[in-house]
Amino acid sequence: MVKYFGDIRPLAGGLKKEEWRHPEPEVGALLRALGKRHEPLEKRLWEGNQLSSTIIILVNGRSIDFLNGIETPLRPDDIVDVFPVEAGG
């Protein structure tokens, strides 16, 4: 399952979450597939071939920054959260 938060939701067609029935082997492949499904989301997710610095991705509540980045492997029952980086002051 993929969950969308904050200003990411409108980019994913207003969805709060969606089931992903075509499991991808790793986070990067999943994000690319989601970007093909939701074109505005793709533009926000990527800066060239790198994940955008304005996005936080969690797999089962753990940041991919502390796992294997976009190469983090996925299992069919994993939950992937897509958050915007919020600026604060």
Question: What do these predicted ranges mean?
Answer:
Residues M1-G88:
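Ubiquitin-like/PB1-type beta-grasp interaction modules and other compact soluble beta-rich domains
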